Amino acid sequence: MPAFMPRPHPSFPALHLACLCLLATPAALASAQLPSHRLDNDVVESRVSEVAGGRLLSFALKGKPNFLLIDEAAGDPAVAPDATSGYIRYQGHEVWIGPQREWWVHQDLNPARAAAKATWPPDPWLSLAKYALVEKKQGELVLDSPASPVSGIQLRKRYALVTGKPDSLRLEAEATNRSGKLAGRDIWFNTRVPAHTMAYMPVASQEDLRIEPSGALRYTLGGGLLSLDLPMPGDAPRKGKLFAQPSHGWLAAFRDGQALVIQFAHQPRAAIHPAQGQVELYQDAVADAPGKGMLELEVHAPYVELAPGAAMRASELWTIMPYTGPATRDAHLDFLRRHAAQLGISIP
């Protein structure tokens, strides 16, 4: 696999009128079980927690509902993770380390999971531990994970509002190999949204797709653009994952008056671990229970052989916009085409 690009250390200029503050009012604590910091520039607002894996808890246009699926009461963040920890479904946005089939094979703290080549749960030290607050300033937050004895990785996460793009948030992840030995890994962004969210991405052909389990999901592919179909009343529940090699570096999601566009560095297929896709959509949806299940919008960075102490970086740029049109594929794609130049995305 090709090596990843050297890691730069960009700084984010302070965004005028942006504020970063710890939510500590009684009203805030009543509505948010996890302690959090807020990034707010009067156009968008988001909340990030040091606990529960340095997780992004919310992102939305100012005054609009949270676009993310979140359950802040899912677990007790004061409980330190260990090698027997299960997964706690806080949801929101988090960063995993791939490939999934190697999650537990490089450690000896839990021999049973190593022997089984367990593919669940993800690394507890990266997903559940409290991160250290490295820096906070106007419009920016930097957090460090502990060094994980499971994956051998330490994560640094940076969340920052974007100068000149008041409707955008940049998410950066830096993964450093602390294992003391060569480690093949990738950075894996995972964003959870409610199950009835409609998702789109550019895909050239069906040869760039696979679904696991086979036949579990339905999609529409036309004109170089893929949409994941939602189950209709009377349809069987949908539960599975679509793996894709996108033709360009973006995906989009629409729900309840907001459109979220996630941009990332497009990679050749050879750069992505063969067990993964650069974009993966995990759907768990039941037509008659739209409040249940979820959709995961997942993006993989290149698979890299990291020397001890070496690091790799990846990022996503999130832009959220108001959307007042019909909840249909044609209307959504027309909206994306009309805003493509503004967003800086390529649409087939």
Regions found by a protein language model. Give the residues of each.
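Bacterial N-terminal signal peptides
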Residues: 14-27
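Secreted/extracellular small peptides and ectodomain modules produced from precursors
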Residues: 10, 17-19, 88, 217
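Surface-exposed acidic/polar loop and edge beta-strand patches at domain peripheries
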Residues: 31-170, 178-348
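N-terminal secretory signal peptides that target proteins for export/translocation
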Residues: 1-12
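Beta-strand-loop-alpha "switch" segments that mediate conformational coupling across diverse proteins
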Residues: 173
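Positively charged, low-complexity intrinsically disordered regions
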Residues: 8-10, 17, 102, 114
